[in-house]
Amino acid sequence: MLLNSSFISLPSFFKSQELGRTNLLIHRNGSPLLCYATNTNVSQRKSANYQPNIWNYDILQSLKHDYEDARYVDRSRRLQEEVKRMIKDENVNILELIDTVKQLGLSYHFEEEIGEALDRFLSLEKCSGRNNFGRSLHETALRFRLLREYGYDISPDIFEKFKDHNGNFKACLVQDIKGMLSLYDASFLSYEGEQILDEANAFTSIHLKDLSEGRSSILIDQVNHSLELPLYRRVQSLEARWFIDSYENRKDANKVLLEAAKLNFNIVQSTLQQDLKEMSRWWKGMGLAPRLSFGRDRLMECFFWAAGMTPFEPQFSNIRKGLTKVCSLITLIDDIYDVYGTLDELELFTTAVESWDINAIQILPEYMKIFFLALYTTVNDFTYDTIKETGHDILPYLVKVWSDMLKAFLQEAKWCHNKHMPKFDDYLNNAWVSVSGVVLLTHSYFLLNRNITKEGLGYLENCPMLLQTPSIIFRLCNDLATSSAELERGEGANSIICYMNENGVSEEVAYKHIQNLLDQTWKKMNKDRVINSPSSKYFSETIINLARISHCTYQYGDGHGAPDTLAKNRIKALILEPIN
């Protein structure tokens, strides 16, 4: 069971909930609070001693990317035509080709051709009567992974033939490193209750770790890469960057695919740099960082997060920029609620946001006034652009999710103030909202969908699980990486501490429980993606990408709040440094 019944029965996040929320928005009451901001001395406030910004925004403005030139775009288009012909060729190993194209970051150019090729592949299989018993482990696992990734109904029972009479995976499979890696990768597309894939994951994990020790080859590098973080859970754009470098070293590398992949990556990266320069000017113009110097100045990290959530395609600039704005505001308000604001001030701010009344700033302290105006202006600008383009007023939806997030922030602040350690389920029911995933995804939905319908809005309201599961993954990844630092700052509850306190277990046991909960939530999201898939495939991809960028950012620590050299190198690889 993923969580207890309180998780399964959570009401829609668009309906009022009894449990307080503490993230980025407001607390709605029937009447305004009849109190005013406290005159707390700055020296009396907590300080998080956050790491300063490590990026020079003036230097970012000087970025110049060679691949902005139209001749590269023309060359890329010619190469794409060659790749299309390859996909349509019935004599190629189509599954291997599709997998390579996908890992190289090229598949978005060929969605129609790939769909037709997979349909053709399945049709030929059916006509020829070929069954699974003639397939190798690699072929079977690759077939399963690709078909499930592309939404085909395929059962994991196809792996039964690789078991012995005792129901265990055959010992002889262990020496097939390529097949074992393919089975390992496939196991991460499992649904709840698919025991054979759980067994496959356990079997391959143990033996691949043993097989990779003391060896060196391109295949072993791939094994170590997947063991570090599974292929399906990786940010696809960063994975393309890594795979291009790996693929170039292979003797069987196709030169057309390799050149097409390099050009495509660099062209999209040049678009990202233009987006980043615009966002750098926006952030500097907002003037929030110097006025709210107690908080984290993380424009670059927020842009990286937005780029990771958004499909890695040049036409999604508006979505990247919109999410960068949202993420930047979330980061600062999180610091207000976690560290700087007094409880009275947080109550006032939560109520002000929920009322969405500009006059509410009159009773806010000065530092909150500027942030309220920044939030008010940004959200209203999103609403204005959407009304202008679609005729739909999305303001109630945006204010609602911001309000719910701030209520969740406020609840956490109260727990901390009262030195209260909540039960694990109470914490998580609040924390999946406070982590801000719903705010990010709701903005994404409206930024991606300019053809907004009543049916679509109903879908957004009535399918909360699609937003809840990636938010839980986001929260758990965050807690695993930041719990120690948060405790040092006196920020109180997180999932690990709550579980330890409630169950009387060690930190190691609690970590294992959270990791298991992460895996179970991924299974739930994998299934929800199929049975409750939104009309927009891009929004569906963005939902999964939220979970992926969470793993990426918190894989080695707090890559957002305290970015280290590894975090900086990831940003440079995706945004700043072209492939030679």
Curated annotation (Swiss-Prot):
Amino acids binding Mg(2+) 3: 478, 482, 486
InterPro entries for the chain: Isoprenoid_synthase_dom_sf, Terpene_cyclase-like_1_C, Terpene_cyclase_plant_C1, Terpene_synth_N, Terpene_synth_N_sf, Terpene_synthase-like, Terpene_synthase_metal-bd, Terpenoid_cyclase/PrenylTrfase
Subcellular location: Plastid, Chloroplast stroma
Chain sites annotated for binding (2E)-geranyl diphosphate: 296, 334, 338, 475, 478
Record note on cofactor: Binds 3 Mg(2+) or Mn(2+) ions per subunit.
Main location: plastid
Example of a GO cellular component annotation carried by this entry: chloroplast stroma
Name the record gives this protein: Tricyclene synthase TPS4, chloroplastic
Species for this entry: Medicago truncatula
Lineage of the species this protein comes from: Eukaryota, Viridiplantae, Streptophyta, Embryophyta, Tracheophyta
